[in-house]
Amino acid sequence: MAVAMTPAAADELHTIVDLIRYGASRFSEAGLTFGHSYDNALDEATQLVLHALHLPPDLGPAYGQARLLRTEKECVLALFERRVTERVPVAYLTGDAWFAGLNFKSDARALVPRSPIAELIQAGFEPWLAGRDVRHALDLCTGSGCIAIAMGHYNPHWRVDGSDISEDALSLALENKVRLLAHNVELIKSDVFAGLVGRRYQLIVSNPPYVTDAETDALPQEYGYEPELGLRAGPDGLNLVLKILRDAPAHLDEEGLLICEVGESEQQLVQLLPQVDFAWVEFKVGQMGVFAVECRELIAHHDRIAALAAER
């Protein structure tokens, strides 16, 4: 049984490092699930401590031995308590999350920003773009707006559209657009491509729902705070992905490129469409499940893709 974080704990903990160590120990003991921006107990405890103390994320190690007021320790312990007993993701406790080097507002209107696509954005999508002249890009299923806004931030000469079916998600994305001065980003309400008639792009990027029904039902409690609309995607996790593959060519230039995240549904997609030349991205951080595919490749196999999508 996890040790309760009683007010008495504040008497035994004195420094920033003390609190970080204590939080990490309690999180590990409680068997928390990590993966919402941070993948381990120590990083989560660090983020909560720095947030509660109004300190920057790049705080130098010299401050680790700074002694805290009792009221400060109690604020930190209250956050630890909620993380352990309620299983609230850290980003929803702090109200923000880092993605591609940018700090986004985060709350239950959209999934917590997290995707290996951040690495691609910061690498300029090379070598996958292969020098293409991108003028107009789309982030399909934008959620909090993190991918669209990060694309616009690192490519100020691009026009970037961010689309989503959820008005709640779009309201959060708008707040992030204002927060990060993303003047070259336009947010659009759209059910996949339905609201994007007549718009064409050189690059489409998407992190759509791709979690199978069975996996969604079995997800740890932390994921229950996120909108299910951003997770659940049918028996094999590919309900929306197949529609994207079917309809993307109508919105891509002839030399256009689609980059899409499918997570653990990668194997199922390859089994369904072995003839399609998906280029699977290898990440420095060891993640998987993101492919790049040429528009011409989708056109060449459109009939097969359309038949599979029609079965959904």
From Swiss-Prot:
EC class (word): transferase
GO MF term (any one): protein-glutamine N-methyltransferase activity
Q: SUPFAM superfamilies, alphabetically?
A: S-adenosyl-L-methionine-dependent methyltransferases
Report the EC number(s), separated by commas if there are several.
2.1.1.298
The source's superkingdom equals Bacteria
Q: What keywords does the record list, in alphabetical order?
A: Methyltransferase, S-adenosyl-L-methionine, Transferase
Please list the reactions this protein catalyses. Answer: L-glutaminyl-[ribosomal protein uL3] + S-adenosyl-L-methionine = N(5)-methyl-L-glutaminyl-[ribosomal protein uL3] + S-adenosyl-L-homocysteine + H(+)
Q: Which GO terms describe its cellular component?
A: cytosol
Q: GO annotations under biological process?
A: methylation
Function noted in UniProt: Methylates large ribosomal subunit protein uL3 on a specific glutamine residue.
Q: Which family does it belong to?
A: Belongs to the protein N5-glutamine methyltransferase family. PrmB subfamily.
Give the protein name, as stated in the record: Ribosomal protein uL3 glutamine methyltransferase
* Source organism (scientific name): Xylella fastidiosa (strain Temecula1 / ATCC 700964)
